[in-house]
Regions:
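Non-catalytic structural scaffold of enzyme domains
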Residues: 9-172
């Protein structure tokens, strides 16, 4: 998994700070895949060193619906600062949409925030993939915070038409 960072000098695992709760279902997936990957890489009973900060998704969703991305950034920046103070070596946001405020979060912390679009671009490049379909919430599909990162790395991004965007958003 792209966010598993191991330094192989005897194997020292880094502590991952997870900003989750958007939704708790997606957070479970991150936690599960992270631990399955650690077990696969290290074997035995190894599990990931991680710290989870779960935000109240109701508050985040209201901010999204009202276009109050500044308040969302404040909430997630507070979460990121808490994770940093708790000892996280880097941070992952356990959802695509909230990467819209990743730049603002980064301004409030002194540890790396791994941007999912950057990590996705790296994996696509490794696989030789140059064209992808982007599905997600309407914010992820219609705004540039994800798409531009891929396009700036030479990856053509295909997005559904407006009716399809609404359908996909409703399903999510």
């Amino acid at each position: 998994m792209f966010w598993v960072i191991l330094r192989l000098e005897g194997v020292i695992m880094k502590t991952i700070g997870l900003i989750g709760g958007m939704s708790w279902e997606s957070t479970i997936t991150y936690y599960q895949v992270l631990n399955e990957t650690i077990k696969q890489v290290l074997g035995g009973l190894h599990s990931a060193k991680c710290i989870l900060y779960s935000v109240d998704f109701e508050e985040i969703e209201k901010c999204q619906a009202n276009g109050d991305w500044n308040r969302s950034a404040e909430i997630l920046s507070d979460a990121a600062q808490s994770l940093e103070k708790a000892g996280a070596d880097y941070i992952v946001i356990c959802t695509n949409t909230m990467h819209k405020v990743a730049d603002e979060i980064e301004r409030h912390i002194h540890i790396p925030l791994l941007h999912i679009a950057e990590m996705t671009a790296v994996e696509l490049e490794k696989s030789g993939i140059t064209k992808v379909g982007l599905l997600g919430t309407k914010y992820t599909m219609q705004q540039d915070f994800y798409k531009c990162i891929l396009e700036n790395r030479g990856i053509h991004v295909v997005i559904p038409n407006e009716d399809q965007v609404e359908l996909v958003n409703d399903i999510i």
